[in-house]
């Protein structure tokens, strides 16, 4: 046992040495630490290594898969596991029960079996016999209390990147152990937990040492770098100052030369401009003097001409006034004659239009030529204010424009045509008077049949039935009273009014044209 413990200590020392060498290799490039910190670091690394091996051996004994992984990948792991198993076997052999104790424990079982006959056992006798036997001593084996091993993960050690791989490897081992869900005795669990706690403390101490060393190294390097940077900055500033001074002097000299050149050019251009201005002023004064002389000469000449005119041509002014008065009188007479002629032509034209509209021809009337002549005469009529100077349009212009819009390129029905169309409508109107309200097809057929038996009225009856209205309209058309005829037709209602709609439009158009011609005639006669 002493040999095994010595071997374990040697293995631990070897692992500590290798861990120290690995740690020193990992943290390559760090500044050299002081002796006391190095010894602390070695102690902590040794404790962490011991805790790692103790936890690995414990888990290997309880989990075969982890044991194979631990023995295959970790140096000296297999020998440590074998040493611990030998130590455990020796302890178990020392605690085994002797032969006498086994006989005392299990001997009474044979006595009970021998007492039972082969033919079977009577329940009553067996119970009495068993009750008479002395009670056997109960031997209890105390079960060891098992605890589930659950190790927490090691947290990342701040912002130290060099300790991160070590922490990640420890966390990977912890995760593998936690996945096995091992059940350990309480003392073993406490030992593993204490070792893991020491491992975490050692990792934290390593992290603190690394941070301290890094901070000191950074401070030293920062001071040296600041000093070097300050010196280089002063050197560059001096060289830059010399360069800027030389550049400024060069630019100043160039600007000075350019300014002198520009000033010389401006002075020369100013002198030239002043010279030209003086020459122009002199020429202007000479021209002004010559103009004054010409004006004086013209004035003298006009005075001489006025004197000559007053002497010999004094009567020409009176003759000129008489000629102007005669010209004005001739213009007035010409205007009156022209106006009279235009008015007479307009009067004749209106009479022609009236006769054309009231003619008894059976053909339609077209007055486009008369309208063109009417517009020409209205345009040349003297004495009318111009359209651009008058705010309100003249009656003559309004009448002519309305006539042009109504009759231009249009055919106007004569009185004979209106009468003939009305005669054609009489039969339909008489038939429509027989239609009931909202008549259908049967109503129209019945009205058409009974219409053949109707008698037409003649003359000017005073009744208000449809036959009397038809008779009065025909009488008014024969007497050329178109306005009264249209008034009678417009008063109709219902289907008769719908039948006469086209006739009413043509009659109204003719009445409007006749009214406009009458208004034009009145305006011409009043002019």
Curated annotation (Swiss-Prot):
It comes from the Eukaryota. One of its GO terms (cellular component) is MICOS complex. Its main location: mitochondrion. Residues 62-527 are mitochondrial intermembrane. The keyword Mitochondrion applies. InterPro entries: MIC60. Keywords: Coiled coil, Membrane, Mitochondrion, Mitochondrion inner membrane, Transit peptide, Transmembrane, Transmembrane helix. Residues 1-24 form a transit peptide. The keyword Cytoplasm does not apply. The chain crosses the membrane at residues 41-61. Residues 313-335 form a coiled coil. One of its GO terms (biological process) is cristae formation. Residues 25-40 are mitochondrial matrix. It is found in: Mitochondrion inner membrane. It is a single-pass membrane protein. Pfam families: Mitofilin. Belongs to the MICOS complex subunit Mic60 family. Component of the mitochondrial contact site and cristae organizing system (MICOS) complex. Component of the MICOS complex, a large protein complex of the mitochondrial inner membrane that plays crucial roles in the maintenance of crista junctions, inner membrane architecture, and formation of contact sites to the outer membrane. Plays a role in keeping cristae membranes connected to the inner boundary membrane. Also promotes protein import via the mitochondrial intermembrane space assembly (MIA) pathway. This is MICOS complex subunit MIC60. It comes from Lachancea thermotolerans (strain ATCC 56472 / CBS 6340 / NRRL Y-8284). The gene is MIC60.
